[in-house]
Amino acid sequence: MKKEALLVIDMLKDFVLSGASLEVPDTRTIIPVIQKEIVRARAEGNPIIYVCDAHDQDDKEFRKFGWPPHAIKGTKGAQVVEELRPAPGDSVIPKNTYSGFYGTRLEETLENMGVDSLRLTGCVTHICIMVTASDAVLRDYKVTVVEDGVAGLAREDHDAALRIMKNVMGVEIVKSGTDISGRIAA
């Protein structure tokens, strides 16, 4: 029997709120989709894991990649948006780079839960979603990305990332409401 975990990646105030330091405008449109995915995961008894950027004020990512400071540990911008707040029993995994696996306890958490399949939502499609999906595939997880539950900085980058994940990595790309077997959930 497959055990799937729902990953909610970087749905933080510094990415979602209007005027935020690294605003991804389309994230606001995916909130209702992610809310439904959370309800579905809870109903199926699947774990929900929030994978969240968490940077030091002088993080090398800002210098190395030219990103503006964002998701600084302890700030409001590093908090999950109110609409998607973690519930008791949900896991929160901080990360300081694009991958949810690199330098984190995500893999250990998944192993302890007996998870073999991941369902990814959040942002940014062509950065943290795609890199986390790649790392998961390389670790032999079955990976599904909810197409209408992820957002990119630009539509063309979002679409390209979905194609690459599907055609190169073997990631399953589905619309929200599709269950682990690929059927449309009731």
Describe the role of every protein-language-model region.
Residues 1-5, 32-44, 68-186:
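Active-site-adjacent betaalpha module
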Residues 5-12:
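Acidic-leg catalytic submotif of subtilisin-like serine proteases
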Residues 9, 52, 147:
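Active-site flanking residues adjacent to catalytic metal/cofactor-binding acidic residues
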Residues 13, 17, 56, 151:
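Short, glycine/acidic-enriched loop or turn micro-motifs at the edges of active sites
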Residues 16-17, 21, 38-39:
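Active-site neighborhood of HAD-like aspartate-dependent phosphohydrolases
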Residues 20-27, 65-71:
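Short glycine-enriched, charge-decorated loop/helix-capping segments at active-site entrances
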Residues 46-53:
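Short beta-strand segments at enzyme active-site cores
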Residues 59-64:
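Metal-dependent catalytic neighborhoods of phosphoester/phosphodiester hydrolases
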